[in-house]
Amino acid sequence: MTDKTFADRIDALEMRLTYQEETIETLNQAVTAQWKQIDALTRQVAELGERMREAEANRPGPTNEPPPHY
């Protein structure tokens, strides 16, 4: 192989590496954004669960009184 062929192959590899680095960075940003959203949703679900438990605890329970028609 000639020096030109090697230089062309190295150039092609460098271009592929550059595109791969860009793709990896884009994917990393997407994953980071998704984790932030997952964390926010997890906190929101926990908060809603706590609010439901509080609402159920504060709800008046059933009384043992017979219905009025007895």
UniProtKB/Swiss-Prot annotation:
Pfam families, A to Z: SlyX
InterPro entries, alphabetized: SlyX
Database matches in Gene3D superfamilies: 1.20.5.300
Disulfide bonds: none
Top-level taxon of origin: Bacteria
Region (Disordered) location: 51-70
Family: Belongs to the SlyX family.
Name of the molecule in the record: Protein SlyX homolog
Organism: Nitrobacter hamburgensis (strain DSM 10229 / NCIMB 13809 / X14)
